[in-house]
């Protein structure tokens, strides 16, 4: 683009010069009229033209033959015009041919049949300019009319033109026309009719205006010949300044006229007049140059401001900033750009800075090396979209009036002056051009408003028809124009999605659409052929294009939806399936979608076929549904295998799964994984097939006894078969004889092939694991070592390594441990059975089993999941050292890669005092691909079970050793009372051994052995590797749960029991060693306390087992309950001794359930006594603290009691005062009653109202009394007698004490009325009462 800047600068200078030249020429011609105007009528005519309206371009004379020759050269590659029509009514008369005379005095024959001299004064674009990309254009040949006086006026008016505006001048691609204007001169002798054929000529605008002092001399050297018959000139052709400069520089401008040998004098006079006119024009140009130089200064100031704006736009592009500075230095002040050019530069820079549509994986995986190696198209294809033929519908650009690439020009043909038939032909020609993305003569691109949104619909190109068109034709054209817009959009979509980064699925879609576009172009060419044969009309064209419009509408919807969703890979397929269900209402549309989907899914199905049949992924553009994590690598797959490799090496992309394979995505993943495993084992799939066939043949041959001749024949056949198999394997070593998957509407086709591939891959891998890698024998070896199935090996190993395991963890010699392990393996029965005994190694875990189990169970207590740290057991990396003071330990802890690391959890689990017995574990080296089944997680589960069983065996061994020592030293016990104590210890020890033996028997014979047999049988009948993995994991999970290692409560109970047994055994052994310092009372207390602890632990364990066994998943615990509580021994014992655990409840509640006492080796008796003394001191301190607390509490209680007593006394005094006040009031009332002697009954007293009130209150307030109306009347009667009889007031109060509610109401009655008012009422009431009493 920067290389075109000088040309654009020249265009602006040239046009500004033309504008100023026209203004100066107008002023000079008005002040100084031209010479010889009277002598030459032609000059009179030109003078009239200049005086009527200002001239726009300098009038020069050019040989018409040159114009015709140039036109013929430009149109050599164009098809001939399809039709010609005349504007005038008179036919063209014959004319004479003349050879033009050039400046070099050499004559060349002309190819034209008419000779005219034309001058142009144009402001409109050329009427017949032919773009280089158009297929065919219509040439309009205008024929001039005959010479007459009436036509002279018309031709003169046609010669006058309007001056060009600035908007027309700044268009860099506006083409000046060469419209001829005929001037006819009337002669007295004859009237000649001449014809001037209107031709088109494309004149370049990038011509620099240069001064040439030899113009006049060159013109004087030209030999000009005149027309015969007294006719000087028939017409002039006025050309713009550009054509004049081109004419002068090339020395090719000549004048041609019809030659007549009889009129030489007239020709010479005419030639002289022409030369004078040229001289005058040259003088005007010299005057205009001064004015142009002054305008340059102002122009440069304006352009400097525009340059600053352009530099701001180019600052974002760091690569191009240096080039811009170099260009500015090179051109300097001479680089002048038009405003339109600057707008185009600004738009291109804006497009470059805009965020381009890119696939999603380019944003998420910018650092991937595979992304960096993707090929790309050059940047100029994006920066300069006008070089591509799809620029009309560039999706990233909205075409406004400032951005259109020299489009939306005025109509080049005036349709109003053309007949209807030819007007329709012009419209058809323009439609054919717009159908392939090219503007026509009358159909242009519609201007898009700048305020419109930037959606995809706004980027759809709209075409506008200009000029006067019939309504019927306009309607047909408007129906066809959407097809042109759809074609431009779809074509640009193809150009964008053909980029490399969009992937092969998008490429296949673009290829399928491109095939449809080729057929579309064939249809356009067929329509053009009918147009040339004049058999095509708009109606016929609409009839032919109706199905095509519907097809392109669907293509537009598909492409626009893909662009809107920014779909990539399989997303395009899913989108096509969605649109198919939405728009496929008829068969043709369904067939179109089927064609697109079939072509689009072809590369995906090839990738799928390669994955499920060979286990290979070829996905350069991240389009396949399986993603390969290339960052996850393994240096040595046989020794240091990581489970993450199998789980995370291949993963499913959820957004790239086709809808018809959604339910089978996991099966597709595992199928390719299986084949990849076989490939990782350095064994091709085809070789595996051949190996299976050869094994079957060998087995059949071994079973049948053959003669010697038959054996020779079989050998020959086998050799020939092997040769054929080798040839096949050499040609296609990695190919499987399977059919390629093809697209089908029936999903069962895919499902059947995927199922077959899955069964085949799983069968190959199972055969590899079971038959070649001996999976069952490996599992049997792990059972022997980790599950303690071989008693002779384990007992021998414990005896030989017991002294070493008593040491602390940092003092254990790993070389010695491994050597002792191998010794015990060689000397036991396993040495003959197991071929893989060398893969077993010793390993020490630097924390206790309790901490490990509780950490796994309560893994959410930590911020991050914990890691199990293991010890490196390789004898090559570990050196044996016995120096405890050295800082370098013999055990190097390494973090396992199966779980996530958590330093905080590791520090919590790690203990300082840890012995070899507590941390011993086995490690087993499993090679690839057996590590798929026996993974690192599975080995950790085996280690947990082994550590638990080993701890039980160790406690059992310690208890048995104590019994043997007691039996050995029993004869030396002479101290009285000691034998009875030992009998109690034997009894408790026997109970502990019984508990341990039954627990071991339950775990080994009722949990591990039956579950292992089930696993073995199910593996033999399994069909896939995933089934084998699932069966093995289920076996380990059931073993852990049934061995009571997955519940915190059960784990704490078991660990407390183990620690109790260890402490009791150490106590009894140390007691026997120090016979002199034996304290019988202290021994009795320790024995009784340990017995109580044992019973408490056993009772809690049995209660928890009973509660757990109620659920169906824990029915297995019933067997352990029956074994521990055989014949209800312990249950009856606990029932007979209900007070056994009452004293222990308070102490046990204070202790935490999650922490168990550490397991320690045997200590001396003195050390144990010291520990007991320390414990006693601590207990005394605790008791003192408790006493102090109790005293404080008692004091507080006494204070509270005193306060309560004081409050009660105050309340009693207040009540007494209130009672006294009430008694005083009652006395006053009685005195008043005695004075009145019963005559003081209230005047307003009413028995009926009182009775009703009494009934209402009793019914509303209480329902417990259940009083009847008769009792109410009795109460009222008593009250009335009491009021009348003042002497018997006390008696009435005692009688009514049983009804306090009535008393309250009676007291509330008013007593101001007199008895005289209610005497009659009282009599009636007494009569009623008497009747009631009688009843």
Swiss-Prot record:
GO terms for cellular component: centrosome; cytoplasm; gamma-tubulin complex; microtubule; spindle pole. Residues 316-332 have a biased composition (Acidic residues). Residues 41-57, 170-186 have a biased composition (Polar residues). It is found in: Cytoplasm, Cytoskeleton, Microtubule organizing center, Centrosome; Cytoplasm. Its main location: cytoplasm. Residues 27-40, 58-89, 102-168, 187-198, 1144-1156 have a biased composition (Low complexity). Keywords: Cytoplasm, Cytoskeleton, Microtubule. Residues 27-198, 250-274, 308-341, 1144-1171, 1287-1309 are annotated as: Disordered. InterPro entries: GCP, GCP_C, GCP_C_sf, GCP_N. Gene3D superfamilies: Gamma-tubulin complex, C-terminal domain. GO terms for biological process: cytoplasmic microtubule organization; meiotic cell cycle; microtubule nucleation; mitotic cell cycle; spindle assembly. Transmembrane segments: none annotated. GO terms for molecular function: gamma-tubulin binding. May be involved in microtubule nucleation. Belongs to the TUBGCP family. This is Spindle pole body component 97. It comes from Dictyostelium discoideum (Social amoeba).
């Amino acid at each position: 683009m920067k290389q075109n800047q000088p040309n654009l600068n020249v265009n602006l200078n040239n046009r500004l010069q033309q504008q100023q030249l026209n203004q100066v020429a107008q002023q000079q011609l008005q002040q100084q009229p031209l010479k010889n105007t009277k002598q030459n009528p032609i000059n009179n005519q030109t003078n009239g033209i200049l005086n009527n309206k200002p001239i726009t371009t300098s009038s020069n004379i050019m040989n018409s033959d040159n114009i015709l020759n140039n036109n013929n050269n430009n149109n050599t590659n164009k098809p001939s015009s399809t039709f010609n029509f005349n504007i005038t009514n008179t036919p063209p008369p014959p004319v004479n041919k003349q050879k033009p005379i050039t400046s070099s005095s050499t004559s060349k024959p002309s190819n034209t049949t008419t000779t005219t001299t034309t001058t142009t004064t144009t402001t409109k674009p050329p009427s017949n300019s032919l773009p280089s990309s158009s297929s065919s254009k219509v040439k309009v040949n205008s024929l001039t009319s005959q010479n007459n006086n009436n036509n002279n006026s018309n031709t003169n008016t046609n010669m006058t033109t309007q001056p060009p505006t600035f908007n027309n001048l700044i268009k860099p691609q506006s083409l000046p026309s060469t419209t001829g204007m005929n001037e006819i001169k009337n002669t007295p002798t004859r009237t000649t009719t001449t014809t001037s054929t209107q031709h088109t000529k494309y004149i370049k605008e990038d011509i620099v205006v240069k001064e040439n002092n030899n113009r006049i001399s060159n013109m004087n050297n030209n030999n000009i010949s005149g027309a015969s018959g007294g006719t000087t000139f028939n017409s002039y052709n006025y050309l713009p300044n550009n054509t004049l400069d081109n004419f002068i520089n090339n020395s090719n401008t000549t004048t041609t006229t019809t030659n007549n040998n009889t009129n030489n004098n007239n020709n010479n006079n005419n030639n002289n007049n022409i030369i004078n006119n040229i001289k005058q024009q040259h003088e005007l140009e010299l005057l205009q140059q001064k004015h142009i130089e002054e305008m340059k200064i102002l122009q440069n100031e304006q352009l400097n401001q525009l340059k600053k704006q352009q530099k701001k736009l180019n600052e974002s592009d760091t690569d191009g900033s240096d080039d811009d500075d170099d260009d500015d230095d090179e051109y300097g002040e001479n680089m002048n750009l038009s405003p339109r050019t600057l707008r185009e530069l600004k738009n291109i820079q804006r497009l470059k800075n805009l965020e381009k549509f890119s696939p999603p994986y380019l944003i998420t995986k910018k650092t991937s090396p595979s992304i960096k190696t993707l090929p790309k198209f050059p940047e100029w294809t994006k920066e300069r979209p006008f070089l591509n033929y799809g620029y009309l519908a560039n999706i990233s650009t909205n075409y406004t009036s400032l951005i259109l690439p020299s489009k939306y020009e005025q109509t080049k043909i005036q349709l109003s002056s053309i007949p209807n038939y030819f007007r329709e032909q012009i419209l058809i020609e323009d439609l054919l051009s717009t159908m392939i993305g090219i503007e026509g003569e009358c159909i242009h691109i519609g201007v898009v408003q700048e305020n419109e949104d930037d959606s995809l619909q706004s980027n759809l190109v709209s075409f506008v028809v200009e000029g006067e068109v019939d309504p019927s034709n306009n309607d047909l054209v408007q129906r066809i124009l959407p097809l042109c817009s759809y074609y431009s959009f779809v074509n640009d979509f193809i150009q964008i999605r053909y980029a490399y980064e969009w992937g092969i699925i998008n490429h296949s879609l673009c290829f399928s659409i491109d095939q449809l576009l080729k057929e579309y172009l064939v249809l356009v060419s067929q329509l053009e052929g009918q147009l040339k044969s004049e058999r095509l009309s708009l109606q016929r064209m609409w009839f032919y294009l109706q199905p095509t419009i519907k097809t392109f509408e669907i293509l537009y919807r598909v492409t626009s939806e893909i662009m809107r969703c920014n779909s990539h890979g399989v997303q395009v397929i899913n989108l096509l399936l969605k649109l198919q269900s939405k728009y496929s209402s008829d068969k043709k549309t369904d067939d179109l979608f089927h064609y697109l989907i079939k072509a689009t899914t072809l590369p995906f199905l090839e990738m799928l076929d390669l994955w499920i049949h060979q286990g290979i992924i070829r996905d350069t553009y991240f389009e396949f549904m399986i993603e390969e994590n290339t960052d996850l690598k393994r240096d040595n797959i046989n020794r240091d295998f990581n489970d993450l490799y199998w789980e995370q090496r291949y993963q499913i992309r959820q957004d790239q799964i086709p809808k018809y394979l959604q339910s089978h995505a996991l099966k597709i993943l595992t199928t390719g994984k299986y084949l990849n495993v076989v490939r990782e084992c350095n064994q091709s799939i085809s070789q595996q097939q051949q190996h299976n066939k050869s094994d079957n043949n060998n087995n059949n041959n071994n079973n049948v006894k053959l003669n010697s001749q038959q054996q020779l024949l079989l050998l020959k056949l086998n050799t020939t078969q092997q040769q054929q198999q080798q040839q096949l394997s050499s040609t296609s070593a990695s190919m499987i004889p399977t059919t390629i998957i093809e697209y089908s509407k029936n999903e069962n086709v895919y499902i059947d092939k995927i199922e077959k591939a899955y069964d085949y891959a799983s069968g190959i891998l199972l055969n590899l694991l079971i038959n070649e890698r001996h999976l069952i024998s490996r599992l049997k070896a792990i059972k022997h070592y980790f599950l303690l199935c071989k008693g002779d090996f384990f007992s021998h190993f414990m005896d030989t390594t017991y002294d070493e395991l008593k040491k602390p963890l940092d003092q254990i010699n790993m070389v010695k441990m491994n050597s002792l392990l191998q010794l015990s393996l060689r000397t036991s029965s396993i040495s003959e059975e197991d071929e893989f005994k060398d893969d077993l190694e010793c390993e020490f875990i630097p924390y206790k089993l309790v901490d490990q189990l509780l950490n796994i169970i309560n893994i959410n207590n930590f911020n991050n999941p914990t890691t199990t740290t293991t010890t490196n057991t390789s004898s090559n990396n570990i050196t044996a050292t016995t120096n405890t003071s050295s800082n370098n330990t013999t055990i190097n802890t390494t973090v396992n890669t199966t779980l996530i690391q958590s330093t905080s959890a590791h520090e919590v689990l790690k203990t300082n005092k840890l012995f070899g017995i507590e941390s011993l574990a086995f490690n087993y080296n499993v090679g690839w691909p057996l590590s798929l089944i026996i993974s690192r997680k599975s080995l950790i589960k085996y280690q947990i079970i082994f550590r638990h069983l080993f701890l039980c065996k160790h406690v059992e061994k310690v208890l048995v050793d104590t019994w043997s020592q007691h039996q050995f030293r029993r004869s030396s016990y002479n101290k009285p009372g000691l034998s009875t104590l030992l009998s109690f210890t034997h009894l408790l020890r026997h109970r502990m051994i019984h508990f341990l033996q039954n627990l071991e028997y339950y775990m080994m014979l009722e949990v591990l052995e039956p579950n292992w047999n089930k696993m073995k049988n199910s593996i033999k009948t399994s069909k896939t590797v995933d089934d084998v993995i699932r069966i093995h994991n289920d076996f380990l999970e059931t073993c852990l749960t049934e061995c009571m290692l997955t519940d915190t409560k059960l784990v704490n109970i078991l660990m407390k029991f183990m620690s109790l047994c260890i402490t009791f055994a150490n106590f009894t052994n140390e007691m026997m060693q120090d016979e002199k310092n034996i304290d019988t009372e202290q021994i009795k207390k320790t024995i009784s306390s340990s017995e109580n602890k044992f019973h408490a632990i056993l009772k809690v364990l049995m209660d928890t087992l009973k509660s757990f066994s109620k659920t169906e998943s824990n029915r297995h615990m019933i067997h352990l309950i029956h074994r521990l509580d055989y014949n209800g021994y312990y249950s009856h014992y606990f029932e007979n001794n209900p007070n056994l655990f009452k004293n222990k409840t308070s102490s046990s509640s204070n202790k935490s359930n999650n922490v168990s006492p550490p397991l320690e080796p045997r200590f001396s008796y003195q050390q144990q006594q010291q520990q007991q003394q320390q414990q006693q001191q601590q207990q005394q301190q605790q008791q003192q603290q408790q006493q102090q607390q109790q005293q404080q509490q008692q004091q507080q209680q006494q204070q509270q009691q005193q306060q309560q007593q004081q409050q009660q006394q105050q309340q009693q005094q207040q009540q007494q005062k209130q009672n006294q006040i009430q008694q005083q009031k009652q006395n006053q009332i009685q005195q008043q009653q005695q004075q009145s002697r019963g005559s003081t009954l209230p005047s307003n007293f009413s028995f009926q109202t009182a009775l009703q009130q009494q009934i209402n209150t009793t019914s509303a307030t209480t329902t417990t009394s259940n009083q009847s109306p008769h009792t109410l009347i009795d109460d009222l009667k008593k009250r009335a007698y009491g009021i009348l009889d003042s002497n018997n007031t006390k008696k009435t109060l005692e009688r009514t004490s049983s009804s306090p509610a009535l008393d309250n109401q009676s007291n509330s009655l008013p007593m101001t009325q007199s008895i005289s008012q209610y005497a009659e009422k009282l009599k009636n009431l007494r009569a009623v009462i008497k009747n009631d009493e009688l009843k």
